[in-house]
Amino acid sequence: MRESGILMPVSSLPGPYGIGCFGKAAFQFVDFLSAAGQTIWQLLPLSPTGYGDSPYQSCSAFAGNPYFVDLETLEKEGLLTAADLKAESWGTDPLEVDYGTLYVSRFAVLRKAYAAWRSQCAGLHGCAYYYPDDYYAFTLANEDWLEDYALYMALKVANKMKNWVEWDAPYRRRDKAALAAFAAANEEEIGFWKFVQYKFSVQWQAVKTYANEKGVQILGDIPIYVSADSVDAWVGGKLFELDADGRFARVAGCPPDYFSADGQLWGNPLYDWAYHKKTGYAWWVRRVRHALGIYDLLRIDHFRGFDTYWAIPATSATARTGKWENGPGMDLFDALEAALGKLPIIAEDLGELFPSVRKLLADSTFPGMKVLQFAFSGGDNEYLPHNHVKNGVVYPGTHDNTTLTDWWENSASEKEKATAAAYLHLTPCKPTAKEVAAVKTAAARTALLRAALGSVADRVIIPMYDWLGLGAEAHLNTPGKLGGNWAWRAKAGFDTKALAAQIEAECAVYCRCNADAQNVK
């Protein structure tokens, strides 16, 4: 089945309270997708943002982002007032997330909502510790991660948000008596973090259910690694490579290459794959099972790391001292499929890959990715549309690429533009510089979008900002850039009927239109 979808982060949805969330705009966007004949809504990870505001550096591999809880829904439930919302600052630019402001304002109102919820529960049942049945059901179903997460966040607050490796030894080393005493003294704070996750879950499941009813599947994204400053690292112990003192022995990154003489030092703890194998990959089974309760499809970031990964001594200042190690390969995916059935996974297989990585992708039968912005460097490039395969997913660009408009105007080299212009029939086959310069940005963008849609690949995912024709202001993430990422938000009213009709028409030409779209009024 040929289908198409749109990449649109929840954070990028419009709304009055600083960041996109699970409110009206999310449901309206589902309506837009359905009207546009789209069957996939691709998201960035829904986990809490961490270092650099990145959803790929989260404090938890299981928790949801508190920022996405819809405040207007809490107001309707009587947990917040209009005055509560008006009292906070939500930033000055509705087209950009101000994470510094958001950190203060969002948690301030969520704490008010929690206090009101506790009072509401006490008033209904005459008992301060009697909560709704669905709350108890949620905490029971998620206790394998929720208890540790709530305790970890309460400890983070008590330690002024310091990295857990800087906590006092009893807490850092998870001394049972110390943790029990802390939990008893901080029951309300721990309860707050559980409450936020409960509301996140209830609200997100409402959005997901609505999307599925409209024929739209949710494509989620899970990073291969966890953050060093995370509850997963704090409680993981033997899951990771540790030295004699219980600290991380080696960390993740990339080797030196043409773009970086020192390589990339990511700093994520590395898995002890031998230990994971002994457990039957139990942690990974839990992680993927949890993700499949949130999403319908999963994109796994840095798929190559399951074959071979770059391991760097934790004390190293650069990635130069690392070396290649073997990952679990098909052994992991066989274990996952044995436990969970056929896996709806899309593998992020971008970059230069060893033959063994390509073999792993083939053995797994997971679809890989092709990115058009990488296609026009010259020669018989594997990303050129005529080299695509049916079992694949095509993107004009990913969240790490700039927009098509900005790529054409500012990022693409003259060689890339000339190659693309000729390939896309925008110029003669051997264009002059003048002929390439005469190509309008809008024409180039449309041609690139149509090249993606016309690919033999089963699926095409187009970022929302490329349908809108936006420039550098919508560039979500520049790898290696510290700060200023993940901030783009769409203008209110972006999802018009006219644009939906245009997208539906473009996709229908290439037999990618959801047949049910014509029945959506």
Language-model features, listed with the residues they occupy:
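N-terminal regions that are enriched for targeting/export leaders
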Residues: 1-11, 27
